[in-house]
Design a protein with these regions (language model features):
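Acidic-histidine catalytic/liganding microenvironments
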Residues: 24, 47, 65-66, 131
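N-terminal Rossmann-like dinucleotide-binding module
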Residues: 1-50
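Rossmann-like NAD(P)(H) cofactor-binding subdomain of soluble oxidoreductases
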Residues: 80, 100, 123-130
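Short, Asp-centered acidic motifs that coordinate Mg2+ and/or phosphate
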Residues: 31, 70-71, 151
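Beta-loop-alpha module in the N-terminal Rossmann-like domain of NAD(P)-dependent dehydrogenases
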Residues: 11, 17, 53-114
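Predominantly a Rossmann-like dinucleotide-binding segment in NAD(P)-dependent oxidoreductases
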Residues: 128-192
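Rossmann-fold dehydrogenase core element
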Residues: 110-127, 148-152
Length: 192
């Protein structure tokens, strides 16, 4: 029996999860939540979902009504991560979140508290950890092949792709919603 997964936030990032899950027999996207019906429709179509999935405008309705879920993948804007994650963690479900965990220290602490008090599990999507370029750098550092690291310069060179993401997702431009450019774009450099 496949794990039943809910997707909260059905914008562009969620499509990557859907594509990965389509290749697996042990995971099934059974529920979508997003206030944007067009996003839900696009996600369902691209994920190849049939009529046997549920969709919701409000994630709270989904949390209340969908009692057989095995986990939640949260692809909502950063400022909503804490609210979404805490709801699912308090129900005892594991959650996967896109980076960053949340845009503020207190929101991060609240997620961690919910995880600890409910014996929960949280995965943060730092996908660059497995990118060949970064794994090679990590290997060179770990093996000591480039000497002692005393300084790192990590330049984020935005191209057309980054510009289109910012235009498509205008919330990313506002620090109170995204956490600012260090959390939104450069957190992967800090993670490394």
């Amino acid at each position: 029996m496949p794990y039943k997964i809910a997707l909260i936030g059905t914008g562009g990032r969620s499509l990557s999860y859907a594509a990965a899950y389509q290749k697996r027999d042990d995971i099934s996207i059974t529920t979508l939540a997003d206030p944007n019906a067009s996003h839900r429709y696009t996600m369902a179509k691209r994920a190849g979902l049939t009529d046997d999935y549920a969709e919701y405008d409000d994630w709270r309705d989904m949390l209340r009504e969908q009692t057989a879920l095995d986990g939640a993948v949260i692809c909502s804007p950063n400022h909503l991560h804490a609210e979404h994650a805490i709801g699912y963690l308090e129900r005892g479900l594991p959650v996967a979140l896109e980076k960053p965990l949340a845009p503020t220290k207190i929101a991060c602490e609240n997620i961690i508290d919910a995880e600890r008090s409910n014996d929960g599990r949280t995965l943060i999507g730092f996908v660059m950890r497995s990118a060949p370029f970064y794994t090679k750098i990590q290997e060179l550092i770990t093996r000591g092949l480039i000497g002692r690291i005393v300084s790192i310069q990590a330049d984020e060179l935005p191209g057309v792709g980054v510009s289109s993401v910012m235009n498509r997702s205008p919330w990313r431009r506002y620090r109170d919603k995204s956490g600012g450019s260090i959390l939104e774009k450069s957190s992967r450099n800090l993670d490394f």
